[in-house]
Curated annotation (Swiss-Prot):
Gene Ontology annotations for the cellular component aspect, listed alphabetically: cytosolic large ribosomal subunit
Function (record text): Forms part of the ribosomal stalk which helps the ribosome interact with GTP-bound translation factors.
GO MF annotation terms: large ribosomal subunit rRNA binding; structural constituent of ribosome
InterPro entries per record: Ribosomal_uL11, Ribosomal_uL11_bac-typ, Ribosomal_uL11_C, Ribosomal_uL11_C_sf, Ribosomal_uL11_CS, Ribosomal_uL11_N, Ribosomal_uL11_N_sf
Post-translational modification: One or more lysine residues are methylated.
PANTHER family, per database record: 60S RIBOSOMAL PROTEIN L12, LARGE RIBOSOMAL SUBUNIT PROTEIN UL11M
Pfam families: Ribosomal_L11, Ribosomal_L11_N
Keyword Lipid metabolism: no
Biological processes, Gene Ontology terms: translation
Keywords: Methylation, Ribonucleoprotein, Ribosomal protein, RNA-binding, rRNA-binding
Similarity comment: family membership: Belongs to the universal ribosomal protein uL11 family.
Record protein name field: Large ribosomal subunit protein uL11
């Protein structure tokens, strides 16, 4: 196997199943000479099983021959927390005003989802991190 020379890494957050050539995708990939339509088709195919509109972080590796590969990550913890608590946005004053509640079981489920991206960390430490995120968006964590 021939090792390709890496030209660039591009990090984007794209809605699942909704990649299209418009900004920010088009300019970011076009600048590196990547076939934008090909990427959009591959990304949409890859994220078809996910909920449409869920923001998915993606790292695109562009090679010197203008080919590419990409890795999709799990949605941000704040998005998963807001979805679990059934709220649209976080609190303007997180430590003073709570906008919702979330159970420890829900925190654990989100931690299991995020564990895929956080290699080397155990579920307990990931759960603590997610509890911190929950508090920072104004969610009360219940046992």
């Amino acid at each position: 196997m021939v090792i390709k020379k890496i030209k660039a890494y591009i990090k984007l957050q794209i809605s699942a199943g909704a990649a299209n050539p418009s900004p920010p995708i088009g300019p970011a990939l076009g600048q590196q000479g990547v076939n934008i339509i090909e990427f959009c088709k591959a990304f949409n195919e890859n994220t078809a099983q996910l909920e449409t509109g869920l923001p998915i972080p993606v790292v695109i590796t562009v090679y010197s021959d203008r080919s590419f590969s990409f890795i999709t990550k799990t949605p941000p913890a704040s998005i998963l927390l807001k979805k679990a608590a059934n709220i649209q946005s976080g609190s303007e004053k997180p430590n003073i005003i709570n906008v919702g509640k979330i159970s420890s079981a829900q925190i654990y489920e989100i931690a299991k989802i995020k564990a895929v991206d956080m290699t080397g960390a155990n579920i307990e430490s990931i759960s603590r991190s997610i509890i911190g995120t929950a508090r920072s968006i104004g969610l009360k964590v219940e046992d």
